Structure formats: structure tokens, C-alpha cells
From Swiss-Prot:
Enzyme class: transferase
UniProt name for this protein: NAD kinase
Pfam families: NAD_kinase_C
Main location: cytoplasm
Gene3D superfamilies: Probable inorganic polyphosphate/atp-NAD kinase, domain 1 (3.40.50.10330), Probable inorganic polyphosphate/atp-NAD kinase, domain 2 (2.60.200.30)
Subcellular compartments: Cytoplasm
Enzyme Commission number(s): 2.7.1.23
InterPro entries xrefs: ATP-NAD_kinase_N, ATP-NAD_kinase_PpnK-typ_C, NAD/diacylglycerol_kinase_sf, NADK
Residues the record marks as active site: D46 (proton acceptor)
GO MF term set: ATP binding; metal ion binding; NAD binding; NAD+ kinase activity
Gene behind this protein: nadK
Required cofactor names: a divalent metal cation
Keyword set, alphabetical order: ATP-binding, Cytoplasm, Kinase, NAD, NADP, Nucleotide-binding, Transferase
Entry superkingdom: Bacteria
Length: 257
């Protein structure tokens, strides 16, 4: 991919390290507006990168992240030199977000996109009770739990992994359905679903056992039902250095201990 320095927009999180990197790189390579850019370089952590991907989704712009945050699993290593060459050699990965359609106890309908996961969790000390349907067929009549989520391959190494869900290769046509602290059924540990599946969560006893939902950082309180599917139209493009590709990161993560 050929990328001139004058077609790069630099954006950063609010941390001191990220702002310093923004100032340094803008002075060195120039600064293009996001609207006119071919590539957006995101400086920060994984959370800021997800925000940048959401902001540029559907525009055709490519996002290249450099780590000025903490973990930076989705980020490339920060180096100020040779940036245009690194971007030109980068491997592009297409990410399809999830679409969440949530209905609240007041009858409000809220839709949002999630690159990582759509998660539901109990709002109070009461255990959540949730019915799970896949493609209009009830698969779990009642899940008693702290929460449950649907994760994309891109999000499988985040909240999903911390809840003991599976790590998915980015090109796997799968979604991870993962419970959080399940109580009953005791032996149910989740499922792998086709990325073409539509999943519906119905909250049982919503007044007694209120549940919140979130598509990444978009939170909806007191939901009665949540429907999730992979978006058929929205896409985002993430760039990785070829020697540190997404598949290599996923493989390495599975051997960490």
C-alpha cells in the first residue's frame, strides 16, 4: 500500500505520552485532516484504537495504531522513524462489528455497533436470569449468571478471554458466546457460533433481576431483550506490521502462562 506522508492524520488519546507522540509525529510527517486522510494513525491504547475504528467505520479509511497506552494488544510498536514505509508494508485486516438492538424496560429501543463484544451483566446483587435463543430457536431456557457476552474474533482476547472464553483467529467465521460466572447450568461454558447467527437474550424477571447491556462502551440500562448479529454492511480496516500480525499475536497469546 502506497501512502504519502501528507495523507496521514494523527490522532491521540488524552494521556501525556500520546499527546507528546502526536506533537512529535505531526512535526515530522505533517498533519492531514481525518476527513482527507487515507490512513489514520491512532496513538494511545486499545480503548482509544477502538474509538478511532468506530469513528472511521464505513469511510474506507485505514487505521494504524501505535502503542502509547498500557497493554496495546491491537497496537503496533511505537517508533517515530520510518513510519510511511511501515504503513506501506502493513498487512490490512478487515473487521466486521456486531450490531446490538436493545429494548429497555421503558420500551425504548437502542442500537449500537461493537467491535469487541456485546455484553450483558446483572445490575444488582441479584443473579441475572437470561434466556438465550439462536436463530429464533431457544438454546438455553434459563442461564443464571453474573453476565453473558457475544465476542467477535477481534474482541476474543479482551473481556471474553478474561471470562475464560476461547481466542478466535481474526479470519474465523465464528462468534464466541461466553457466560460470566455461570451458576446454572453449572457445566455450561459457552458456545462457538457461526458469524451468520442471530442471538437473542431475553431477561427473565427483569424488575426483580435488572440487567444492563453494552456494545463496547455504549451502555444501555435495564434491558428486557437484546438481539445481536454481525453487521452485514459496516466494516473497519486495521493495519498491522507484517512481523507482528494479528494471527501471530493470537497464537502467542494462547501460549502465555
Amino acid at each position: 500500500m502506497s501512502t504519502a506522508a501528507n495523507s496521514i492524520a494523527f490522532v491521540s488519546s488524552d494521556t501525556a505520552d500520546a499527546k507528546a507522540a502526536l506533537e512529535s509525529l505531526s512535526a515530522r510527517y505533517g498533519q492531514c485532516s481525518v476527513a482527507e486522510a487515507v490512513v489514520v494513525v491512532a496513538l494511545g491504547g486499545d480503548g482509544f484504537l477502538l474509538q478511532t475504528l468506530r469513528d472511521t467505520m464505513g469511510t474506507g479509511k485505514k487505521v494504524y495504531g501505535m502503542n502509547r497506552g498500557t497493554i496495546g494488544f491491537l497496537m503496533n510498536e511505537y517508533r517515530s522513524g520510518g513510519l510511511t514505509e511501515r504503513i506501506a508494508a502493513a498487512v490490512a485486516e478487515t473487521i466486521r462489528p456486531l450490531e446490538m438492538l436493545a429494548v429497555t424496560s421503558e420500551g425504548e429501543t437502542v442500537s449500537a455497533l461493537a467491535i469487541n463484544e456485546v455484553a450483558l451483566w446483572r445490575q444488582s446483587y441479584q443473579t441475572a436470569k437470561i434466556r438465550i435463543s439462536v436463530d429464533d430457536q431457544i438454546r438455553l431456557e434459563e442461564l443464571s449468571c453474573d453476565g453473558v457476552m457475544i465476542a467477535t474474533p477481534a474482541g476474543s482476547t479482551a473481556y471474553n478471554l478474561s471470562a475464560h472464553g476461547p481466542i478466535l483467529p481474526l479470519d474465523a467465521p465464528l462468534l464466541a458466546l461466553t457466560p460470566v460466572s455461570p451458576f446454572r447450568p453449572r457445566r455450561w461454558r459457552g458456545a462457538l457460533l457461526s458469524n451468520k447467527a442471530t442471538v437473542r437474550f431475553d431477561i427473565l424477571e427483569p424488575e426483580k433481576r435488572p440487567v444492563n447491556a453494552a456494545a463496547d462502551h455504549t451502555e444501555v440500562k435495564a434491558v428486557t431483550s437484546v438481539t445481536v448479529r454481525e453487521s452485514p454492511t459496516a466494516t473497519a480496516t486495521l493495519l498491522f506490521d507484517p512481523n507482528h500480525s494479528w494471527n501471530e499475536r493470537i497464537l502467542a497469546e494462547q501460549f502465555r502462562y
